[in-house]
Amino acid sequence: LPRHTLHCVAYHGYCFHSKV
């Protein structure tokens, strides 16, 4: 898995990059 994964939060309605 890539370190930078794009997480889309449906219940918040936005996407953010997480360094996991």
From Swiss-Prot:
One of the protein's GO biological processes: defense response to bacterium
Primary location recorded for the protein, binned into one broad class: secreted
Ranges in coiled-coil conformation: none
Domain of life the protein comes from: Eukaryota
Places the protein is found: Secreted
Assigned keywords, A-Z: Antibiotic, Antimicrobial, Defensin, Disulfide bond, Secreted
Cellular component terms per the entry's GO annotation: extracellular region
Disulfide bond among keywords: yes
Family: Belongs to the beta-defensin family.
Physiological role: Has bactericidal activity.
Protein name: Beta-defensin
